[in-house]
Amino acid sequence: WLVALLGMATKYAECLLAVKYRVRDKYGFMAGGPMYYIERGLGIKWLAKLFALFGVLVAFFGIGTFPQVNAITHAMQDTFNVPVVITATVVTVLVAMIILGGVRRIARASAVIVPFMALGYVTTSIIILIVNYDKLPAAISLIIQSAFNPQAALGGAVGFTVMKAIQSGVARGIFSNESGLGSAPIAAAAAQTKEPVRQGLISMTGTFLDTIIVCTMTGLVLVITGAWSNPE
């Protein structure tokens, strides 16, 4: 939750700057992001190029693709016994059809898929929480106790436990909302708006909904159902 609050401020700043320093490319689309406001705002061209290079590498080989596809393929294999190769091929084809259509097709696909995806996920989570409402207090208590386990206080280990809890929370929070990573500003720069401040405010709500609302519900569902202690 703390990461979400700090991330909201970060997301606001980076998306505001993305709209403020964006440019129109030769195809007529708005392009922006950290590499643009680093070059046009700070005037450090070499750093902007370096960010763009590492941004491409991360998008291709890092958190931009591998974790998501890995989660989908293994979920299909574990739940429906669908071979990983088949699921990966289908995902690749579908994603290629959307990406090759450019920014507009990506926006249209996101406008259709994301609302239904989010609504279905949140609705299912709420139903599970309502059905198991009597377990909510114990689940919340377990989450808090697990973060600061008093049994780990032997030999000064409590400091290490707190440190690991913070590291884990920060890593998962940033991975979830992407605040400060530079990916969100690239998308925000393509927004059809002339108000950088407004876009910054809109972008920061995504961090709140994703990390504070959705991640909290996910954690409670995992604890209530016992899935956290029995991944299978």
Labelled PLM ranges:
Residues E14-K20, T124-L142, P150, L154-A157, ...:
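Extracellular/periplasmic helix-exit of transmembrane alpha-helices
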Residues L2-A31, T92-V93, I224:
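Juxtamembrane transmembrane-helix boundary signature
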Residues L2-T10, L47, L53-F66, T205-M217:
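Membrane-embedded alpha-helical segments of transport systems
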Residues G33-Y36, N70-A71, G182-A191, V221-V223:
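Re-entrant/interfacial helical elements at transmembrane boundaries that shape
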Residues C15, V19-F60, F80-N81, M204-T207:
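Transmembrane-helix boundary/entry motifs in multi-pass membrane transporters
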Residues I44-F60, T89-V90, A152-S176, I213-V221:
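Select transmembrane alpha-helical segments in multipass membrane proteins
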Residues A18-R24, I98, G173-E178, S183-P196, ...:
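Helix-loop junctions at the membrane interface of multi-pass solute transporters
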Residues V69-M76, P83-I144:
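Membrane-interface loop-to-helix entry segments
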